[in-house]
Structures are given as structure tokens and as C-alpha cells.
UniProtKB/Swiss-Prot annotation:
Organism superkingdom: Eukaryota
Protein name (Swiss-Prot/TrEMBL): F-box/WD repeat-containing protein 4
Subunit comment: Part of a SCF (SKP1-cullin-F-box) protein ligase complex. Interacts with POUF51.
Function (record text): Probably recognizes and binds to some phosphorylated proteins and promotes their ubiquitination and degradation. Likely to be involved in key signaling pathways crucial for normal limb development. May participate in Wnt signaling.
Keywords for this protein: Developmental protein, Repeat, Ubl conjugation pathway, WD repeat, Wnt signaling pathway
Gene name linked to the record: Fbxw4
């Protein structure tokens, strides 16, 4: 892939600024008409046309031609609504890379190892990776290839007395949930750290958007907090969930939030609450078996969200159509718990399972799993506690190590 990009760059450097005067009359049509004609071509036809001459190579590399193809491909940086999240990278290059995701072509490497079993969580931001280890959050810098790290962390965030269970990045802050029942607020670019008692038992999950923090705990409550520095620790709402709260997420509209609970004390593991009043708005689904706890939940848009957990399903919910029935679901073929999920905002779904460090890739337009990667052997079987991906790499955090699946240089 890197060689292809270098070849394209070298060719572009010597290409003429204008189209050739000789040749078929077709090439002398206005560019608008040529773009319209070429828009009917698929990936293979565009690639062959690019081999005709240097001018056509440049012309067929136009983002306008590749954008519809990219929107139908896996993990090209386009959301379902067409928003381009990676405008600085040529669309053609992203479509090339997408083929590796579709075909499962990648190379597995171990980025970090640790001596004792952990339950790590991680987040990505720009060229940095944030990883929880015991009661610390470590910040690592990626090397330029994105497939390796500087082994020494450039920042260490501390403050919890027990393990960090979960954390999120919120603009210039890290908000962490600890096994000590406390929430920690750390400024990324300074030494500012505050922690406060939030729950009677461990805080299993936390989210932060728009200056509001929500947290969920083993003590069967969810709470709403302000992020403002002068009001840290002042609880705005306490919600009795009647169940352990495993996961939590704030709606992009900042009007509500969803809790994923253990489904032991209450019949519904997915409930949506009003962020301003703390009142129940609705619950999602019906007929969940006891113990069908939701371990991960995420909003994809204000009206759509995904959930996964102990009942071995990933479910896609659209609040505009129904709150009682999901619009799509994907089942773990080996009846394993889903610990975590991540999407590209469009067609690609990645999940982490409870055994053998199993990462699965799914094309959301079909029910069957696209590819599966086992990152551990039987003696060291581990859940995938957290995974994140970019258009080039997928990172998976296991009990004893951090893996990267490199799709750029398979």
C-alpha cells in the first residue's frame, strides 16, 4: 500500500498540467461530461482507465469519482450520512485500503505486554493512545507508521486507589471511573487532577459530553454530574436503576442518556433517561432473558445506537421506528459474550468476544461474520476488553497485552 502511494505521487510529479491534444475525441469532452461518464465506472474499470496515460491517471484519481465507491466500502472515513471524517487523505487511497478490511488482510503484532492480568480500557486521540493499567492511565505516542508505540508513556494520570474500570476523553479532560467508587477528572495538558466520591461501590462506566458527566455503578444507581471546575462532585441527579450498571452513553443531542444494566433486578437492560430531569423516557426491547446484561453501548446518531453483552448479540436500535424491536442484530457464532464494539459510522462493525482474544469484523449489510481473528492461544485465553480502530489499524486490549492488526502493511 505504501509503495502504491509512492508510485502515484511520483507519477503525479511528472504528469502534464493539461490533457493531451492527441487521442480519441472522447478525451476532448468538457471535464464535467467526462466526470459524469466516469461516474458509472466501478473500481476495476477506473483502475484500468488510469493505466491508459498519465493525464487519465490523474483525472481518474479525482475524489469526486471515488466518493460514491468509498461510501459503499468498509472503513473509508465516511459516515452513513456522507460526512467525510478524513478529508485530508485522498479518497482513492482509502478505497484501496478498504479492500484489505474486506478481505481480512492484516498483520497481527503485539504493541505492549504487562506481567499481571489486567482489565484494560483505552481511547485514541490524534497520534496518542491512552490505556488504563491498574489504577493508572498511561498516555503513549504513536510512531509515524501507527503500528508501533514509543514504549515509554509521555504522561501518567493517577489518583484512584483501585483499578480504573473505564474512562473517556472529553475535549481537554480525561474522566475516569474507579473501583474505589470515585470519579477522576484529569486535564490532559496540565497536572490538574481531581477525584471525588461518586458511588458506594465501584464505578463501572462513565461518559462525558457537553460539560455533563454520567456514571453507572455496581450500587445500582446512575448519576449525573457537572464537569465545571467549580461544581465538581455536586450530584445533579441520582437514578435508582434496580440493577448493576455496566455501560452508559450520552446522546449526541445532550438531552438524554442510555444505561446498559445487568438484567438481574429489572426486566429491561436498556433504558433511556432524561438528562435534565433524571426521569425514565423509555426502555428498549422486550423478553430479555435474566442475566442478559449489556456490557457496551454507543450512540451512532441521536436516533440510532448499538448494544452488546452477555446474550451474545449485537443489536442496532433505531428510535424512530421502534423502541421494542431492534432493526438489525448479529449473533456471536460460538455463543460467546460480546465485551465491546466499535463502528466506522457506516458499514463496518468490530466486536471483541469473551474467549481467545477473538476480534470479529462484520459488514452491517449482512448477518454473517466477515472475518475473525484469534489473538490468544488456549492457555492464555482472554476476553477482548476494549478495541478501537482507524482506517489503517485496529487495536485490541487483552488481559496481558495490547495487539494491533495492521491493515496498511499486511
Amino acid at each position: 500500500m505504501a509503495e502504491d502511494a509512492a508510485e502515484d505521487a511520483a507519477a503525479a510529479a511528472v504528469e502534464p498540467a493539461t490533457r493531451p491534444a492527441a487521442g480519441p475525441a472522447l478525451w476532448r469532452l468538457p471535464e464535467e461530461l467526462l466526470l459524469l461518464i466516469c461516474s458509472y465506472l466501478d473500481t476495476r474499470a477506473l483502475g484500468r482507465l488510469a493505466q491508459v496515460c498519465r493525464w487519465l491517471r490523474r483525472f481518474t484519481s479525482c475524489d469526486l469519482l471515488w466518493r460514491p465507491i468509498a461510501r459503499a466500502s468498509l472503513n473509508t472515513g465516511f459516515t452513513r450520512l456522507g460526512t467525510d471524517l478524513m478529508a485530508g487523505i485522498p479518497v482513492k487511497e482509502r478505497v484501496k485500503l478498504s479492500q484489505n478490511w474486506r478481505l481480512g488482510r492484516c498483520r497481527d503484532r503485539i504493541l505492549l505486554k504487562w506481567r499481571y492480568s489486567q482489565m484494560p480500557w483505552m481511547q485514541l486521540q490524534d497520534a496518542s493512545l491512552y490505556l488504563s493499567q491498574a489504577n493508572f492511565i498511561l498516555a503513549y505516542q504513536f510512531r509515524p507508521d501507527g503500528a508501533s508505540l514509543n514504549r515509554r508513556p509521555f504522561r501518567v494520570f493517577s489518583g484512584h486507589d483501585e483499578d480504573v474500570c473505564h474512562f473517556v476523553l472529553a475535549n481537554s479532560h480525561i474522566v475516569s471511573a474507579g473501583g474505589d467508587g470515585k470519579i477522576g477528572v484529569h486535564k490532559i495538558h496540565s497536572t490538574f487532577t481531581v477525584k471525588y466520591s461518586a458511588h458506594e461501590q465501584e464505578v463501572n462506566c462513565v461518559d462525558c459530553k457537553g460539560g455533563i458527566i454520567v456514571s453507572g455503578s455496581r450500587d445500582r444507581t446512575a448519576k449525573v454530574w457537572p464537569l465545571a471546575s467549580g461544581r465538581l462532585g455536586q450530584c445533579l441527579h441520582t437514578i435508582q436503576t434496580e440493577d448493576r450498571v455496566w455501560s452508559i452513553a450520552i446522546s449526541p443531542l445532550l438531552s438524554s442518556f442510555v444505561t446498559g444494566t445487568a438484567c438481574c433486578g429489572h426486566f429491561s437492560p436498556l433504558r433511556i433517561w432524561d438528562l435534565n430531569s433524571g426521569q425514565l423516557i423509555t426502555h428498549l426491547g422486550s423478553d430479555f432473558p435474566p442475566g442478559a446484561g449489556v456490557l457496551d453501548v454507543m450512540y451512532e446518531s441521536p436516533s440510532t445506537l448499538l448494544s452488546c453483552g452477555y446474550d451474545t448479540y449485537v443489536r442496532y436500535w433505531d428510535l424512530r421506528t421502534s423502541t421494542r424491536k431492534c432493526v438489525m442484530e448479529w449473533e456471536e457464532p460460538h455463543d460467546s459474550t460480546f465485551y465491546c464494539l466499535q463502528t466506522d459510522g457506516n458499514h463496518l462493525l468490530a466486536t471483541g468476544s469473551s474467549y481467545y482474544g477473538l476480534v470479529r469484523l462484520w459488514d452491517r449489510r449482512q448477518r454473517a461474520c466477515l472475518h475473525a481473528f484469534s489473538l490468544t492461544s488456549t492457555p492464555l485465553s482472554s476476553p477482548v476488553y476494549c478495541l478501537r480502530f482507524t482506517t489503517r489499524h485496529l487495536y485490541a486490549a487483552l488481559s496481558y497485552n495490547l495487539h494491533v492488526l495492521d491493515f496498511q502493511n499486511p
